[in-house]
């Protein structure tokens, strides 16, 4: 009993050691807890964030460096590897690989259709790729051989536009597709249009001053024609006035012979020659009009025939000077007037004046 008690007491006595062990355990537990917390903090960014970083940056890549920097800063890890990781994602590698794979496929399909380069004639051709390559890939240009270009240029020289049967025939002869022939003709028409427009613009710029000089020369040429036509009109009016003057003289002679009031003498002859010397000049009718108009009126009326010889004084030098003075302003006005006086009319007027002077001197 005592032994057992001793055992129990020993056991009881041994409890403080256990208590001591238990009392010594809390710091171990604290260390364990702190280590577990540290391990958890270490394990969290290594295990949990990768799927978080793989999903979120694809949706919002700008938010990734903001979350990564505060999490990795207490551990001393640099954020550079996290920033370099996004361009190396597998889905991005697959897309790049797909682009690289699509480009050779498209080039091989275009090469299978025909050689790819620029045509020497400057007419680029775009070929439609047969395979389902990348939608954004640019279609390349087709090169034509010299024989193909020669035949196409010949056909374009004769026909700017092709009908479909002829287009199919040319495509079969030149080993081209119908679309290639159609596009070549479209581009060739545009090139021809540009060339013609540039030539027209160049010719218009080169002929600008020459055309203006030609216009001035035409105007200068038209002026003499107008003068000549005016001279012809003056000649026609002069001849018409001569005829009318002759008819007036005949009428005057018939009237004077019918009445026979007094024999005609030198003064009556002067009166018969005096009337209307001015109808040849259109501008002189205003100044010499009263004197010239009174002649036929007085000659046609019976009182004019009854006038005695003493009333009609022979023309003196003063009267001739007055007549010339009266005629000179009319001539100056006629020269200033826009109506041109022909030389024939002027000569006829001067001849009429000289005949009057000669008749006056004879008496």
Curated annotation (Swiss-Prot):
Keywords: Developmental protein, DNA-binding, Homeobox, Nucleus, Transcription, Transcription regulation
GO molecular function, one term: DNA-binding transcription factor activity, RNA polymerase II-specific
Annotated compartments: Nucleus
Broad class of where this protein is predominantly found: nucleus
Domain of life: Eukaryota
Any one GO cellular component localisation term in the record: nucleus
Pfam families recorded: Homeodomain
Alphabetical list of PROSITE patterns matching this protein: ANTENNAPEDIA (PS00032), HOMEOBOX_1 (PS00027), HOMEOBOX_2 (PS50071)
Motif stretch (Antp-type hexapeptide): 88-93
Region of interest (Disordered), ranges: 30-88, 98-117, 189-220, 268-308
Record field: compositional bias (Polar residues): 31-44, 103-113
DNA-binding region(s) from the entry: 137-196
Recorded family membership: Belongs to the Antp homeobox family. Proboscipedia subfamily.
General function of this protein: Sequence-specific transcription factor which is part of a developmental regulatory system that provides cells with specific positional identities on the anterior-posterior axis.
Name by which UniProt lists this protein: Homeobox protein Hox-A2a
Taxon lineage: Eukaryota, Metazoa, Chordata, Craniata, Vertebrata
Name of encoding gene: hoxa2a
């Amino acid at each position: 009993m005592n032994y057992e008690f001793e055992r129990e007491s020993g056991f009881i006595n041994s409890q403080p050691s256990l208590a001591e062990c238990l009392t010594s355990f809390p710091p171990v537990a604290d260390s364990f807890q702190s280590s577990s917390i540290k391990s958890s903090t270490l394990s969290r960014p290594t295990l949990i964030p990768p799927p978080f970083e793989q999903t979120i940056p694809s949706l919002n890549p700008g938010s990734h460096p903001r979350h990564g920097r505060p999490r990795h800063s207490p551990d001393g890890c640099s954020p550079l590897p996290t920033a370099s990781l996004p361009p190396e994602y597998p889905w991005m590698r697959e897309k790049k690989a797909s682009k690289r794979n699509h480009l050779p496929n498209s080039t091989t399909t275009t090469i299978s259709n025909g050689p790819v380069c620029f045509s020497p004639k400057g007419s680029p051709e775009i070929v439609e790729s047969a395979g389902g390559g990348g939608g954004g890939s640019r279609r390349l240009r087709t090169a034509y051989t010299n024989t193909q270009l020669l035949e196409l240029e010949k056909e374009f020289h004769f026909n700017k536009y092709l009908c479909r049967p002829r287009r199919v025939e040319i495509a079969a002869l030149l080993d081209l597709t119908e679309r290639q022939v159609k596009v070549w003709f479209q581009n060739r028409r545009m090139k021809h249009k540009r060339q013609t427009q540039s030539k027209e613009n160049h010719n218009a710029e080169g002929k600008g001053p020459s055309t203006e000089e030609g216009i001035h020369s035409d105007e200068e040429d038209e002026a003499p024609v107008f003068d000549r036509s005016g001279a012809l009109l003056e000649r026609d009016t002069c001849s018409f006035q001569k005829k009318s003057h002759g008819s007036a003289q005949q009428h005057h002679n018939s009237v004077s012979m019918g009445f026979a009031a007094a024999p005609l003498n030198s003064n009556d002859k002067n009166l018969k020659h005096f009337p209307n010397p001015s109808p040849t000049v259109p501008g002189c009718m205003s100044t010499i009009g009263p004197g010239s108009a009174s002649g036929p009126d007085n000659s046609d009326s019976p009182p004019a025939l009854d006038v005695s010889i003493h009333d009609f004084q022979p023309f003196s030098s003063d009267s001739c000077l007055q007549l010339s003075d009266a005629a000179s302003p009319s001539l100056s006005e006629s020269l200033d007037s826009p109506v041109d006086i022909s030389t024939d009319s002027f000569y006829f007027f001067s001849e009429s004046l000289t005949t009057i002077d000669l008749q006056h001197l004879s008496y």
